[in-house]
Swiss-Prot record:
Cofactor note: P700 is a chlorophyll a/chlorophyll a' dimer, A0 is one or more chlorophyll a, A1 is one or both phylloquinones and FX is a shared 4Fe-4S iron-sulfur center.
Family assignment from sequence similarity: Belongs to the PsaA/PsaB family.
Catalytic activity from the UniProt record: reduced [plastocyanin] + hnu + oxidized [2Fe-2S]-[ferredoxin] = oxidized [plastocyanin] + reduced [2Fe-2S]-[ferredoxin]
Record-level Gene Ontology MF annotations: 4 iron, 4 sulfur cluster binding; chlorophyll binding; electron transfer activity; magnesium ion binding; oxidoreductase activity
Subunit architecture: The PsaA/B heterodimer binds the P700 chlorophyll special pair and subsequent electron acceptors. PSI consists of a core antenna complex that captures photons, and an electron transfer chain that converts photonic excitation into a charge separation. The eukaryotic PSI reaction center is composed of at least 11 subunits.
Record's subcellular location: Plastid, Chloroplast thylakoid membrane
Organism the protein comes from: Glycine max (Soybean)
Gene: psaB
Protein name: Photosystem I P700 chlorophyll a apoprotein A2
């Protein structure tokens, strides 16, 4: 009996129904709830699993390098990045007929292949890789790191190498090591790689271990560094006629502040990037020496927080009690980490297209679209997770006595005001934005398009102008040649920046109008509503006027029995569950907007977006319907083409998505009755009744069915849009 799954919960292991299996899977990673768990084992398990996570990441990235080296066309792509399609890997499928073999044989390959839309070719090229041998070397190195990570994970589970709880709670040492060691040293090392390998590579010099010490990255060597003439490193940058990867038009500078983009590659100057990483390294190396450890110098975070008492006393006791609250709650720490990572991931999406760092990636439109969408969806899931763990913190770890009248307690004290303000903002945005869209639809439907309400986003245009965009005619700050800001930066970084902002060949500061104004507010509605649901879930997690004892029921409960009305659907988990739908919805609008605006930009018919985006039918007809027409003809009565796989995935995504509703709209009793009928029939059917079950079949719990429904909804939604995005972009631009 003791060996039945799940071993971490004897109570569940003895459950005679199928609940044992599903609850076992659901709580497998909730280490806190396991039998015999101690704080020490909890920290050690999580620590060891981090090494497992690293091993998986290194193995996966190693696989990317290996498959491109083995089955890709990296060396051919390097010769002509703009016209050769990068191959991710070969496809071996015995079911392919001749038309499919021909359709998927591209990029100079001998057989069917997948095209890479991940940007790895551009990245590897930019950082100095040139041959398949380089890729194999990288793959082997990452495989080695993966093995080391696995060994480290195993080692830290052995009694002799298990760290103590005090080691895990030594926040100052951890911060110092992470700031200096992880961020500082790795940024410095990356600067070194860029200066010694990537920049020479961009100038036609092939630097590897065998000649690393004999090729100087800069003709003056280390002389200027030791004599304080650092400005020499910025002199003689690459010229505007520089051909990337060749000495033609190349300079000698290694650390510059040029601004703008390399004219040929349309990506940031490598020498600017190296300079940026050096500055980051310096900042983080300093930051990693700020906190007090064994040496008695530096800041104590606890002292810093305790000293932060707001003036005037109107904000209570400020940060008192926060240090111990955060340091003793893994959920609080995870919530903070997820919130930060979520913001960073969304920023990556925004900056990868507007300020592309990798050579030629800006001209690979499908990759640009795929990377933007990928990072925004990832950000959405990470951000909702931050609030989920924030809510679990309030339920499991929050101690009111420890946090009396500090910022946390005051958030809870003022939750009604916070939630109602968010609600008001959401309602205002929703009704006004929808009102404008629907009004415009009615005007077009009634044949009076001139009566649309079209609002110019003058404040946003003013901000763009302040940053140097001249087309709107605002004479302000960087768009005014007389301003001190303009004159101060004139000789340093501004020429490159101003050229980039005012050139129409990139995505920096796109021209905006009434359609942008409307969709911006639709997105704001989505963001505020998602935030409202998440914030309400976390702030009401401990209890509310309706259910003051909510925290005693845990993070996810369906209801408090039939006798207590209104207690269904109000667990913190339910808030997370509802918020994910809104999150997906919002990111849908974000990616629709980004994609449609860019498709019209790349095709040179921007007026289509400008004219059709001001009413709902325009979005449905001229974005969704028009761009799916090519996709759904991936296979038809006349044959198939290279979009057929995306056409199939588009269909399949819709099916997965629709399956979600089966779990979301029918409730537990229906399934329980159905299961009992099926079990009755099974037991009375010859042959079938030879198969017996150890666990009595029962329906999923309400919460579990919602999770399964949500998973299908999310996965189907993302698969559908991914297929649409990649097919509609690659179908137009190759």
């Amino acid at each position: 009996m003791a060996l039945r799954f799940p071993r971490f919960s004897q109570g569940l292991a003895q459950d005679p129904t199928t609940r044992r299996i599903w609850f076992g899977i659901a709580t497998a990673h909730d280490f806190e709830s396991h039998d015999d768990i101690t704080e020490e084992r909890l920290y050690q398990n999580i620590f060891a699993s981090h090494f497992g996570q690293l091993a998986i990441i290194f193995l996966w990235t190693s696989g990317n390098l290996f498959h491109v080296a083995w089955q890709g066309n990296f060396e051919a792509w390097v010769q002509d990045p703009l016209h050769v399609r990068p191959i991710a890997h070969a496809i071996w499928d015995p079911h392919f007929g001749q038309p499919a073999v021909e359709a998927f044989t591209r990029g100079g390959a001998l057989g069917p292949v997948n095209i890479a839309y991940s940007g790895v070719y551009q990245w590897w090229y930019t950082i100095g890789l040139r041959t398949n041998g380089d890729l194999y070397t990288g793959a082997l190195f990452l495989l080695f790191l993966s093995t080391i990570s696995l060994i480290a994970g195993w080692l830290h589970l052995q009694p002799k190498w298990k760290p103590s709880v005090s080691w895990f709670k030594n926040a100052e040492s951890r911060l110092n090591h992470h700031l200096s060691g992880l961020f500082g040293v790795s940024s410095l090392a990356w600067t070194g790689h860029l200066v010694h390998v990537a920049i020479p590579g961009s100038r036609g010099e092939y630097v590897r271990w065998n000649n690393l010490l004999s090729i100087l990255p800069h003709p003056e060597g280390l002389g200027p560094f030791f004599t304080g003439q650092w400005n020499l490193y910025a002199q003689n940058p690459d010229s505007n006629s520089h051909i990337f990867g060749t000495p033609q038009g190349a300079g000698t500078a290694i650390l510059t502040l040029l601004g703008g983009f390399h004219p040929q590659t349309q990506s940031l100057w490598l020498t600017d990037i190296a300079h940026h990483h050096l500055a980051i390294a310096f900042l983080f190396l300093v930051a990693g020496h700020m906190y007090r450890t064994n040496f008695g110098i530096g800041h104590s975070i606890k002292d810093l927080l305790e000293a932060h008492t707001p003036p005037g006393g109107r904000l209570g006791r400020g940060h008192k009690g926060l240090y111990d609250t955060i340091n003793n709650s893994i959920h609080f720490q995870l919530g903070l980490a997820l919130a930060s990572l979520g913001v960073i991931t969304s920023l990556v999406a925004q900056h990868m297209y507007s300020l592309p760092a990798y050579a030629f990636i800006a001209q690979d439109f499908t990759t640009q679209a795929a990377l933007y969408t990928h990072h925004q969806y990832i950000a959405g899931f990470i951000m909702t997770g931050a609030f989920a763990h924030g809510a679990i913190f309030f339920i499991r770890d929050y101690n009111p006595e420890q946090n009396e009248d500090n910022v946390l307690a005051r958030m809870l004290d003022h939750k009604e005001a916070i939630i109602s303000h968010l609600s008001w903002a959401s309602l205002f945005l929703g009704f006004h934005t929808l009102g404008l869209y629907v009004h415009n639809d009615v005007m077009l439907a009634f044949g009076t398009p001139e009566k649309q309400i079209l609002i110019e986003p003058i404040f946003a245009q003013w901000i763009q102008s302040a940053h140097g965009k001249t087309s709107y005619g605002f004479d302000i700050l960087l768009s005014s040649t007389n301003s001190p800001a303009f004159n101060a930066g004139r000789s340093i970084w501004l020429p490159g920046w101003l050229n980039a902002v005012n050139e129409n060949s990139n995505s920096l500061f796109l021209t905006i109008g009434p359609g942008d104004f409307l969709v911006h507010h639709a997105i704001a509605l989505g963001l505020h509503t998602t935030t409202l649901i998440l914030v309400k879930g976390a702030l009401d997690a401990r209890g509310s006027k309706l259910m003051p004892d909510k925290k005693d029921f845990g993070y996810s409960f369906p209801c408090d029995g039939p006798g207590r009305g209104g207690t269904c659907d109000i667990s913190a988990w339910d808030a997370f569950y509802l918020a994910v739908f809104w999150m997906l919805n919002t990111i849908g609008w974000v990616t629709f907007y980004w994609h449609w605006k860019h498709i019209t930009l790349w095709q040179g018919n921007v007026s289509q977006f400008n004219e059709s985006s001001t009413y709902l039918m325009g979005w449905l007809r001229d974005y969704l319907w028009l761009n799916s027409s090519q996709l759904i003809n991936g296979y038809n009565p006349f044959g198939m083409n290279s979009l057929s796989v995306w056409a199939w995935m588009f269909l399949f995504g819709h099916l997965v998505w629709a399956t979600g509703f089966m779990f979301l709209i029918s409730w537990r009793g229906y399934w329980q009755e159905l299961i009992e009928t099926l079990a009755w029939a099974h037991e009375r059917t010859p042959l079938a009744n030879l198969i017996r079950w150890r666990d009595k079949p029962v329906a999923l719990s309400i919460v579990q069915a919602r999770l399964v429904g949500l998973a299908h909804f999310s996965v189907g939604y993302i698969f559908t849009y991914a297929a649409f995005l990649i097919a509609s972009t690659s179908g137009k631009f190759g």
